[in-house]
Amino acid sequence: MLRYSPMSSLQYPSSLLQSMILPMRFRLLLSVVSCLYALCLSVLGAPPLEELEQAAFENASRAVQDSVVQVETFGGAELVNRQFAAAGPSTGSIVSSDGWIITSSFPFRNQPASINVILANGERKPAKLIARDYSRELALLKIEVDTPLTPLLASDRKAWQVGQWALALGKTFGPEQASCSVGILSAMGRVWNKAIQTDAKVSPQNYGGPLIDLNGRAMGILTPINPGIVSEGEVEQWYDSGIGFAIPFQDILDRLPRLQAGEDIYSGRVGFRWKGNDEYSEAVVLQGITPGSPAAKAGIETGDKILAGGPAPDQLVAIRNHSDLKHVLGPVDAGGTIVFEIERSAERRQLQCELVRELPTYREPFLGVLIDPTADPKTPVIRGVIPESPAMKAGLQVGEIIESIDKQSINQERTLDVRLGNLNYRDSVPIVLK
């Protein structure tokens, strides 16, 4: 411990002095090494770090100049969802040498009368809108070419690291030179596992342009997709928010054959809803199943607990909460399949669903009985029967107990309401009474 002397000076123990001297020696050595390194750089004429970074940015941007085009639209609706539709030029990215161009669907919300693509050499080509990916806010264009174009090359997704440099390119000011903003890859698996995130400055004119690495390879295509998007008219609220999103380029290439065939792509819907509102702390316990939905056809029931999900039985990932479920469902398109591992009555089973674009219109099944609210839910007692209802036509009587419906017993977990909720409107099912 420190000792106080009458001279108001501090005397340190020898062990403490030794521990202080070592860091001081280390700092002195580090300073000497730094000075020598700086001296060597000045003698050898090596460029400073800022110049090396600038050269890397310029080389990466230059590598994709011919693969980035300007997209012009003309005509179409002036208002979309009570907002003025975009009319200025936007950006496209060449994905094949024979004239296929991926871009954002942002300029096409107003259904333009004509589309032009301006290549890097200034040549203007008429373009056709072939298909759209509504889930990712993308569109595929086709132009006719006389000479092969230079397509983007895909970045190695396995090598990505959060924090690495990322460059956002767009043909904002003219077709000859792409504008470039510098940032980092700030997050992956965003927008329910459909996008990557960057802090590079992104504007509506950059949408459709590539997000590239320092090797000039495409990491993704910039798009106005956002986590809370409900309709196309809401994309502007994220402009200049400090972050931007890009759809991974390899994901686009995987779907390219479908788009080239003229097939529009939509988000897949499964047809169940779950209990609770906490995204991160509550397990996924199903509260309802839409009749006729993929979930209903797969045999998923109200009360099931979802434990895992994935594209195949050997590719399941754990689903611990609502957020995990959304990340599993997010990238699955309509027509795609997903396997769920569920827990029901302490037993585990795997069920496969084929997701659809739209769920069938739900009409709540109507039996026509009033249940005694004081009765045990496991033994629902009929308190009243509504005239002309299915229950009256079937001969149900006041005082009877409903034991099962559609060959499914009534119990604490599977109450009468739950069993009815799993039926379709106008289903004809057997009811066992006591």
Give the predicted meaning of each segment:
Residues I101-T103, N215, M219, A295-H322, ...:
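Conserved PDZ fold ligand-binding element
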Residues P107-N110, W238, A308-E341, S404-V432:
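PDZ domains, with a preference for the canonical peptide-binding region formed by the helix
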Residues S67, N81, A85, E144-L152, ...:
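Active-site region of chymotrypsin-like
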Residues P48-S61, L149, L214, A218-D278, ...:
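C-terminal cap/linker of serine protease catalytic domains
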Residues Y207-P210, Y280, T290-I306, V328, ...:
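PDZ/PDZ-like domain micro-motif
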Residues V68-E72, I101-S105, A159-T172, I184, ...:
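Active-site-proximal beta-strands of protease catalytic cores
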Residues A46-E51, G76-A77, S96-A178, V191-Q197, ...:
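Conserved active-site neighborhood of the chymotrypsin/trypsin-like protease fold
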